[in-house]
Amino acid sequence: VEIKSTKGKPVFIYAILPLDYEKGLDSIAQMHLQQYLKKHNLQPGITIHRGHSYWVGSTIRNLPPSSKIVILGSCGGFHNLDDVLKTCPDAHIISSKEVGTRIINEPILKAINDELKEGKDVEWLPIWKDLTAQFPTGDAKERFDNYIPPYKNLGALFIKAYTRQMGSME
C-alpha cells in the first residue's frame, strides 16, 4: 500500500497490510516491499512496526539502514533495541515496554506525520508533551506511559554510548 500526503510537504508511506503469518504471506509481502523500494531507489527514513510482537523479528531483519526513526509499537518492543541499533546505530526509537496498542500508536504516528507535512524537524519534547495531554487519565494514560520516547529511552542511549566507547577503544 502506498499513501501520499495531499497537503503540505510530500510524505510517502509504504505499508504492508496484515496477512496470514502462518502461511508466510507477511514475509512474502515484506520481501516485495523491499524489492519495490530498491527498484525505485527509495530509502525510508522512518520504519514502523505495528501488530503482534511475533512479527517484529521479520521487520527488524528487513530494517533499512536509512531509518532515522524506528517505532516499535507492538507489545514489548523495548526488548528489541539492540537488534534495531545494530542496523541503525543512530536511530531514534519509540518502543513500548508492555502492551502496544492502536489507540496509542495512531496519535504518535499522526503527530510525527503532521510535523513532517509542515516541513518541521521532529522534536520529541514538544511532541511528547502534546501526546501526554491527549491521555490524561485512565487506561489510555496507563498504556501511553508504557511507551518510551527517544529522549527517555535509556536502554537505547546506553547501547549507543557503549557502542561508541567500544569503537573509540579499537
What do these predicted regions represent?
Residues 124-170:
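Caspase-like cysteine protease fold
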Residues 10, 14, 84-96, 154-157, ...:
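Bimodal feature
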Residues 20-22, 26, 82-83, 90, ...:
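Acidic-enriched, low-complexity/disordered segments with a strong bias for Aspartate over Glutamate
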Residues 30, 34-35, 43, 134, ...:
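Residue-identity detector for glutamine
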Residues 1-37:
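Functional beta-strand-loop-alpha-helix junction segments that form "active/interaction loops"
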